[in-house]
């Protein structure tokens, strides 16, 4: 099956985000096993949030591909790099890191609007993150992306998900109040099935609501890739 055709590439270039249906369905079982192993044995980079209202937690951990065999198999044996190169229009793709995000049933934690690039020690125009659903997710609980925001040439101030600034003395622009002005933006979101992937540019503004499903987990494996023009950048203050 051809998951990436010319229209998919055009949509990604224009909007900075595109849904790729069924792209990683053959890897579901392996990635789910890897997520279970990670939750049982998280890394020192694990960052979880427990809501004050007593609802279920939001688990996060990243850069575990080299110690979770199932993740390592996915990175090296799937067509992840091939798909990334096509979307980025890059001759090659370089794996940057993995990121696991699990919102347990009914978790009230909201993922705030942000761009990924300001958090990273990498620069360049060619980038893609595959937000791979390991469970069915309704449009109301899915990732949301602001179409075209990757073309604004603005990198907004990165904040921790608790609202604190990530870097000291950062004078970059705050993320605009999108939720109060949703009609002013073209917001992309989808009803997605397990095995689907949302591919988005590191510069794309995106966020996600609480897990509105009180009976199902919202497990996501994200894989971040960079292209030919990637260079290291030292973002002071972290």
Question: Whereabouts are the PLM-identified features?
Answer:
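Histidine-centered catalytic micro-motifs
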Residues: 110-118, 145, 205-208, 223, ...
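Feature marks short, surface-exposed loop/turn motifs that line or immediately flank catalytic pockets
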Residues: 27, 104, 138, 152, ...
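A short beta-loop-beta micro-motif enriched in histidine and acidic residues
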Residues: 115-127, 185, 192, 216-217
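Non-heme Fe(II)-dependent double-stranded beta-helix
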Residues: 1-14, 19-113, 119-121
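Double-stranded beta-helix
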Residues: 139-205
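Short, conserved beta-strand element in jelly-roll/cupin
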Residues: 121-138, 224-227
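Non-heme Fe(II)/2-oxoglutarate
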Residues: 44-53, 156-161, 194-199, 203-238
């Amino acid at each position: 099956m051809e998951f990436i055709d010319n229209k998919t590439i055009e949509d990604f270039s224009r909007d900075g985000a595109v849904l790729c249906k069924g792209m990683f369905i053959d890897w579901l079982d392996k990635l789910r096993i890897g997520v279970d192993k990670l939750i049982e044995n998280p890394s020192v980079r694990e960052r979880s949030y427990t809501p004050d209202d007593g609802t279920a937690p939001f688990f996060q951990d990243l850069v575990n591909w080299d110690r979770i065999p199932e993740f390592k198999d996915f990175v090296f044996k799937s067509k992840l790099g091939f798909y990334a190169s096509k979307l980025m229009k890059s001759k090659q793709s370089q794996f940057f890191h993995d990121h696991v995000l699990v919102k347990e049933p009914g978790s009230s934690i909201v993922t705030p609007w942000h761009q990924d690039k300001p958090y990273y020690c990498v620069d360049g125009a060619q980038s893609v993150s595959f937000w791979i659903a390991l469970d069915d997710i309704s449009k109301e609980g899915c990732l949301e992306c602001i179409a075209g925001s990757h073309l604004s040439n603005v990198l907004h101030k990165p904040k921790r998900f608790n609202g604190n600034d990530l870097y000291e003395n950062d004078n970059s622009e705050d993320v605009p109040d999108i939720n109060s002005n949703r009609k002013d933006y073209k917001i992309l979101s989808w009803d997605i099935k397990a095995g689907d992937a949302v591919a988005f540019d590191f510069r794309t503004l995106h966020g996600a609501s609480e897990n509105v499903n009180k009976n199902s987990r919202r497990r996501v494996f994200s894989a971040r890739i960079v292209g030919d023009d990637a260079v290291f950048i030292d973002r002071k203050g972290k």
